[in-house]
Amino acid sequence: DQEYNVSTVAKSGTVTFNAPWQGGFDLSGIYYVANKALNNIIKITQEGTCSVFSTETTFKSPMSVTFDSNGNMYIADRDNKAVKKITSGGTVTNYDMSSLKAGPNCMAVDKKGRIFVGTGGTYQLHMFDTDGTLKTVFGTGVVPTAATYSDGEQNDLSKATMGATFGIAFGPDEVLYITDYTMHTIRTLTPDAEGDYTKGTLKTIAGIPGTKGKIDGSALTATFNCPASVLVSDKVYIADEQNHLIRTITVNK
């Protein structure tokens, strides 16, 4: 087995951290993290130098920061019910979510520039199309139970359910990984042949719907307790919030 070392790369000093949430790397390798309780974004260089990211816009409980392939920054501005896009030149675009019951917890941007958004209270996955139109990808809008939990059918998400989510991330081949915080599962959403996620296929890949625990092993019998953030690289990494653990999901070959 591999051995790992843990070290602190950024800590309070010239800046103050208070409930740092999710972050992302820009194209030059600088890390930006949503500093939720202080309503700002912290910039962390590769040397560990921290500063408050300066912008003309203001935030209210920012939850997540991510970047697209062109270097544009996206911020989940939860309590303002908006996603903010900030270009390298400082231009800010506001993607409004005020029509929904809850603001954004997490985001992921695909290769076409569509912004996928997870929330804690709509019980749906949302998407801003390239023209800025807000759409529902799937979810009935009702909090699921173990009895009503459903992935829907292949290329038919009309009956698919979704709990709260704090983590979505794209993996290889534009498959979207989703943590279902309410139902303690990890799911994937694969688009149809035309790249349409609203007609895609949803699949639970890990966890037992509605069952809390911290059992490792075969993914569909393993258990989580409120899985939050997800990161996809060579493995799938899960922040298992209430178990206070970092978990990995690997594919058996």
Which residue ranges define each predicted feature?
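Loop/turn-rich, solvent-exposed surfaces of beta-rich toroidal or solenoidal domains
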Residues: 167, 179-185
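Residue-level detector of Asp-centered blade-edge/turn motifs that repeat once per structural unit
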Residues: 25-28, 67-70, 109-112, 170-173, ...
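Gly/Pro-rich loop segments of beta-rich domains
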Residues: 2-21, 48-63, 89-105, 133-166, ...
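Short loop/turn segments immediately following beta-strands, especially the blade-tip
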Residues: 189-197, 249-253
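Conserved beta-propeller blade signature
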Residues: 30-33, 72-75, 114-117, 175-178, ...
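Blade-level signature of beta-propeller repeat domains, shared across WD40, Kelch, NHL, RCC1
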Residues: 226-253
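Short loop/turn segments immediately following the C-termini of beta-strands
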Residues: 36, 78-79, 120-121, 181, ...
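A short loop-to-beta-strand structural motif that recurs across blades of beta-propeller domains
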Residues: 5, 39-43, 81-85, 123-127, ...
